[in-house]
From Swiss-Prot:
Compartments, as annotated in UniProt: Plastid, Chloroplast
Gene3D superfamilies per record: 3.40.50.2020
Gene encoding the protein: PRS2
UniProt-annotated binding residues for Mg(2+): D214, H216, D225, D229
Name the UniProt record assigns to this protein: Ribose-phosphate pyrophosphokinase 2, chloroplastic
Entries under SUPFAM superfamilies matching the protein: PRTase-like
Record family assignment: Belongs to the ribose-phosphate pyrophosphokinase family.
Organism: Arabidopsis thaliana (Mouse-ear cress)
Length: 400
């Protein structure tokens, strides 16, 4: 019987790609941190802005993010005091899907991960045992339902059930990547709406609330009969783009398909109301996309393609090829969830994309690293959201 025990060491080391000396492969968000000697909440102290050195090709370099577009991560003295006196009513546990992200969240919050033993039996069954009391506690379980999707989903359900049976006061499922989110409607006869089924399973297991990052479609929130906090990862990516010193006059935001226009429009609005272009495509099968034509002007521009998921990368790469054909100077791909199913890496590293910017909502295997890849951490965003949910404070104000 294989086993995996997830515990927190007495002191948490900051991951290398969160430090100021991060490698070129792992470029973190330009959010900076301040810490104190005692274990306390880590707070955001500022954001990097575009420098204003001199004009480039006749266009002044101006910040593409201003003070009104930056989320105000608030300092709560009450919460900090709570942590400093070892608040036992807030518990954070990690599943096995993305323990690195869970540890970063705990580091941001000034907490230690709860102790839990997760085992795999020889026949594939999953066993979960909490190694500390959660009676009367506000419990948050961090577990993206990424590959292997069914196994990680089942693990989450069993963790929720274990917390409920251990008399936790509230159980929140923190799902950075929500598997089956793309199965949110019927496109052909006799199909299942698996996203609704998964929502039912999580609810019936005993979860009181769900936190999810950049759901494929907004209507998925309505599939749950419990509250859902939709965490938008745009601030992390926007902050990183601000550090690129791209002239706002040279920028165009591109939606890789018609279905993502609303997402791209919201993204463009934050980039000084950058112009919008749309790639029109026709899908002939699952994981197969064909680019048809481009709506909008990208000639001589820096094109930023915005999507929620990169799976096989067919949509992104074919879109990038079309943008180059239409005269785009550079093409960037910005995506929250890096699924990277084969042959995604071969396509993304082919040279069509200047940079592929993703987040760590699900782990990226080392074998899938390539020179153009940049991974940003959403730990701050999730940690702040968890604090606000625990404190009964506004979550939506983070993204306004």
């Amino acid at each position: 019987m294989a086993s995996l025990a997830l515990t927190s060491p007495p002191s948490v080391k900051i991951p290398s790609y969160l430090s100021s000396s991060s490698s070129s492969l792992f470029s973190r968000s330009s959010i900076s941190f301040r810490t104190t000697e005692s274990r306390s909440r880590i707070c955001v102290s500022g954001y990097a802005k575009c420098n204003l050195p001199k004009a480039l090709n006749g266009n002044a370099r101006v910040p593409i993010i201003n003070e009104t577009t930056i989320p105000k991560f608030f300092d709560s003295s009450r919460l900090e005091k709570s942590v400093s006196r070892n608040n036992t009513k807030l518990k954070l546990f990690s599943g096995t899907a993305n323990p690195a992200l869970s540890q970063e969240i705990a580091w941001y919050m000034g907490l230690e991960l709860g102790k839990v033993s997760i085992k795999r039996f020889a026949d594939g069954e999953i066993y979960v045992q909490l190694k500390e009391s959660v009676r009367g506690c506000d419990v948050f379980l961090v577990q993206p339902t990424c590959t292997p999707t069914n196994e990680n989903l089942m693990e989450l359900l069993i963790m929720v059930d274990a917390c409920r049976r251990a008399s936790a006061k509230k159980v929140t499922a923190v799902i950075p990547y929500f598997g089956y989110a793309r199965a949110d409607r019927k496109t052909q006869g006799r199909e299942s709406i698996a996203a609704k089924l998964v929502a039912n399973l999580i609810t019936e297991a005993g979860a009181d609330r769900v936190l999810a990052c950049d759901l494929h479609s907004g209507q998925s929130m309505g599939y749950f009969d419990i509250p859902v906090d939709h965490v938008y990862c745009q601030p992390v990516i926007l902050d990183y783009l601000a550090s690129k010193s791209i002239s706002s006059e040279d920028l165009v935001v591109v939606s890789p398909d018609v279905g993502g226009v609303a997402r791209a429009r919201a993204f463009a609005k934050k980039l000084s109301d950058a112009p919008l272009a749309i790639v029109d495509k026709r899908r002939h099968g699952h994981n197969v996309a064909e680019v048809m034509n481009l709506i909008g002007d990208v000639k001589g521009k820096v094109a930023v393609m915005v999507d929620d998921i990169i799976d096989t990368a067919g949509t992104i790469v074919k879109g990038a090829a079309l943008l180059h054909e239409e005269g785009a100077r550079e093409v960037y791909a910005c995506c929250t969830h890096a699924v990277f199913s084969p042959p995604a890496i071969e396509r993304l590293s082919s040279g069509l994309l200047q940079e592929v910017i993703v987040t760590n909502t699900l782990p990226v295997a080392e074998k899938n690293y390539f020179p153009q890849l940049t991974i940003l951490s959403v730990a701050n965003l999730l940690g702040e959201t968890i604090w606000r949910v625990h404190d009964d404070s506004s979550v939506s104000s983070i993204f306004l």
